[in-house]
Amino acid sequence: MKAGIVGLPNVGKSTLFNCLSNAKAQSANFPFCTIEPNIGVVNVPDTRLQTLEELVKPERVLPATVEIVDIAGLVKGASKGEGLGNQFLANIRETDAILHVLRCFDNNNIVHVDGSVNPIRDKETIDIELQLKDLETVEKKLEKVGRAARTGNKEAIKEKEVLDGVKNALEQSKNIRSLELKEEERLEYVKPLQLITDKPVLYVCNVDEAAAKTGNAYVDQVKEAVVGESAGLLILAVSIEADINELDSFEERQMFLEDLGLDEAGAAKLIRAAYSLLNQQTYFTAGEKEVRAWTIPVGTSAPQAAGVIHTDFEKGFIRAEVISYEDYENYGSEAKVKEAGKMRVEGKEYIVQNGDVMHFRFNV
């Protein structure tokens, strides 16, 4: 599960990446300081995991993770290979979701690549480059499909019809994630193309300290611009996150946040938002040796969830013993949950719920 941080040079994305991963990507005030994509594996903040640790007292605890990639800065003309364009577009294609950082603050000491602060223009600059790259991909596919359609192949005719609609949308500067398509059309004809503008996106509005809680006029412009785009939006003061990163203890960080009137670090909110953006949820396994959070897509069946641990678990699945997280917390132990008759035995058809504590029975 991989999310890529993108944005024009000097919008704060490498600083944000540093805050998320504590990996010290070179954060300089000039374009292209991130030439190779920096990759960080980031723990997903989850208070339920802490509670299970306190109740079970295991030897170790393993949280769910998201891979965050800081992708090299983009400029106009990237789709034609300008700047680091080709590399940027190859790196972003490999991600599952996009975290698009927009500069929503004024600061004369930080140069803007286009000379002035305008988050809508910045968004459009990146959108256009991604749309042009997607258009290139779709046109190549249409050449092939068009030849088959001309022979009267019904499947090819249907595919051409869908892809013509996709091409038309891109030519009108529309992102494919907001294009209305039947689910089967999207799955069969669009998903295999791995179009960049079809990936889920979270717009991260990088504001100054004064706007950290409620946003500002720049954020309002972005909110208006992304209506109907099936996108998420998060307000974040990257400079505050950088300051928090310098504090050693949890207590110091909490005091710092309270002084600013914030309930938690923006980085934690962002990681959870990325997790949600990817339509992921968590189930837990809890034993003396290990308490662990496992990542699965929403709608996963019990055998598929077992397969995340090991493929043998899925192949030989017999049943799952399931405790809801709420029951585990309320009763305080697996034994007490069993006594209360709250442990359920579920079969192959069971759809795992967010927060389920599970134990699998299987046959190899």
Go through each PLM region and give its residues.
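Conserved Switch II/interswitch segment of TRAFAC-class P-loop GTPases
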Residues: 40-45, 72-82, 93-154, 169-183, ...
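C-terminal-of-GTPase-core extension/linker across diverse P-loop GTPases
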Residues: 2-6, 11, 17, 144-351, ...
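Short amphipathic alpha-helical segments
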Residues: 28-29, 110-114, 215-217, 247
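Conserved G1/Walker A P-loop phosphate-binding module
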Residues: 1-111, 139-140, 145
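Amphipathic alpha-helical transducer elements in NTP-driven molecular machines
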Residues: 32, 46-49, 62-68, 82-95, ...
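Short, intrinsically disordered, mixed-charge
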Residues: 22, 54, 90, 94, ...
